[in-house]
């Protein structure tokens, strides 16, 4: 089970209930959040009923949790992003642009069959182009700690510890990633807090495309009928409500349906304690 933090800076949020002075202070406050600089995994055990449970072992090297080097202000991944000439204007060691202002903001994760990890970038969107980073983490046994270390390896043509894939998502950033067979489903949305209906793009045969790429290759994936298309979604759930219901996550419900979860869900989605209504849409 893989997890990734946004690696973004956060800006204070103005509110109608505050006076002008307080709102100006909030908008001028940009700071890191230690919980955001994380990439790691925990091992899952599968029983005979196809149910999974987390492995909490600290001794078995094959099932120990693992994470990349990180602290309260950065990580191995963010250090690499800062070295990337495409992103240096968005982040440096002295600060940067907050995530919700089209700064660095990671959302969405999917794994390939050869051990690579794909992370989607909600921002920055560069002149309408969204970016997926392909990572190749390697586990390093760390017997004197509670978790092993993951180390990113250099891949791709840039000498960085990731390879970039550039996607034409009509100006939207990436909110989540999900495999559907060999196709990669991409939940897209604004880099800021704008309202938007759920948008899902299908990168056809993406799994095969990764396998065919040479080690020194990066590609632009343009919208076309045979490669990258926007999905037509037939909703069988509640419709997204303006001012709320920001599509945040997707997962296959079955072979013909996709489940969509929302950040800041409408109050209409809460019908009993400890539960929330999501949408099931036709693929």
Q: How does the language model describe each region?
A:
Residues 1-283:
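Sequence/structural signature of beta-propeller domains
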């Amino acid at each position: 089970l893989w997890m990734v933090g946004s690696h973004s800076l956060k800006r204070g949020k103005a509110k109608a209930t505050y006076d002008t002075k307080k709102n100006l202070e909030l908008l001028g406050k940009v700071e890191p959040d230690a919980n955001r600089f994380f990439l790691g995994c925990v091992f899952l055990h599968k029983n005979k009923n196809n149910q999974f449970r987390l492995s909490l072992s600290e001794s078995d090297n094959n099932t120990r949790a693992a994470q990349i080097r990180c602290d309260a202000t950065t990580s191995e991944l963010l250090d690499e992003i800062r070295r990337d000439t495409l992103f240096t204007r968005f982040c440096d060691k002295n600060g940067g642009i907050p995530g919700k202002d089209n700064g660095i903001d990671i959302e969405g994760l999917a794994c390939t069959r050869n051990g690579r990890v794909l992370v989607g970038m909600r921002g920055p969107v560069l002149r309408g182009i969204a970016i997926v980073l392909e990572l190749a983490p390697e586990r390093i046994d760390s017997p004197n700690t509670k978790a092993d270390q993951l180390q990113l390896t250099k891949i791709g043509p840039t000498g960085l510890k990731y390879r970039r894939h550039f996607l034409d998502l009509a100006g939207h950033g990436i909110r989540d990633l999900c495999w559907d067979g060999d196709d990669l489903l991409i939940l897209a949305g604004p880099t800021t807090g704008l309202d938007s209906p759920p948008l899902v793009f299908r990168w056809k045969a993406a799994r095969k495309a990764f396998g065919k790429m040479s080690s020194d290759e990066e590609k632009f994936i343009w919208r076309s009928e045979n490669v990258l298309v926007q999905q037509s979604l037939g909703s069988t759930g509640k419709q997204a409500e303006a001012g709320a219901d920001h599509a945040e996550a997707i997962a296959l419900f079955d072979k013909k349906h996709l489940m969509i979860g929302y950040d800041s869900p409408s109050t209409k989605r809460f019908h009993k304690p400890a539960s929330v209504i999501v949408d099931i849409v036709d693929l």
